[in-house]
Amino acid sequence: MASLESSMEAHLQLYEIFLTAAKPMALQAAVLLNIPDIIGSENQLSMEEIASHISASTNKPVHIDYLSRIMRLLASIGVFTEENTVDNRGIPQLKYGPTGLSKLLANNEAQQSCAPTLLFLNQNIMAQAYQFLHDTVIDGSQAFTKANGMNLFEYNSKNPEANRIFNEAMTAQTSSVMASVLKAYGGFKSFKSVVDVGGGAGSAISTIVNEYPHIHGINFDLPHVVRTAAPAKGVQHVEGNMFEKIPSADAVFMKRILHDWDDEHCLKILKNSYDAIPEDGKILIVDAVIDKEKGTKRQVGLMSDLLMMAGCIGGKERTEEEFKDLFHKAGFKSYSIIEIPFYHALIEVSK
């Protein structure tokens, strides 16, 4: 009997893994239906009230049964609260309210929504790439390219909508991460110029310059990316290729860039960064450093590592030892790791 119970528990654990995709897809449905905003930060709403808001915004009827099943799952994983109440006629009903998770998916001025990141990761082009992970193991091929006929960056350059979704996701991630970076690192005050390599729309370097107005900020990225970047006070948008040359500055800043590439490409980026800074300059890297201790932070890092494996050319999340080896090969003498919340770290690298 004990072995049967153990076997069935194992089956249950496997099925939880098998069906995990239902969670982000239900979350996406809620975001596209604007439910985090409908519920907001304080409201406790019945299914009928939520449905009424959706119907008003879409001008279409809502199938409440289907909606309730989505909400039931999301409440079970902590995205919304679920409370048994009675209406003014004494009839039992469920009411749904906000949590810290749902607030992070709503649009508000206080913080950047995480919804764009969800929509980016849930795209068909990303899901299809995972179908080829086994080929990556056998022949070293790039899963995203096999699935979509070109790598992610080429795809974005040829598809404006995909490029928009990607840039919105990167901007969303930047807002929360940069707040932690600025709180943890005071070294920016000693720099007169900072170049953000792979800076996208320029949100990270704009955040730095807003906090330290004396800094001349350079947002450096590929031409098709820089073309969509809005003008920003104190920031110069420069197009180019980080594998060829990086603009000179007192500090080179890179947020979630090295994890896109294999060691060979990372060495080119780091060596070009070395050439771009003076002897007392710094390289500032914001990236995941895979945690040694078991827990959510390590698991998220490992899942992100698999995302890099599927989505990028040799992309990977790295351990501290792997970063140390790259820095040594690129000619740098020392580095220090500054812990910040989430699963990222800030790495300061010196000549």
Each language-model region and where it sits:
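Short beta-strand "wing" residues that participate in macromolecule-binding interfaces
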Residues: 81-82, 98, 285, 334-337
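Short glycine-centered segments of the SAM/dcSAM-binding site in methyltransferase folds
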Residues: 280-284
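Class I SAM-dependent methyltransferase SAM/SAH-binding core
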Residues: 193-245, 251, 268
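C-terminal alpha-helical "lid/dimerization" subdomain adjacent to the S-adenosyl-L-methionine
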Residues: 286-330, 335-336
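Hydrophobic beta-strand segment of the Class I
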Residues: 252-253, 257
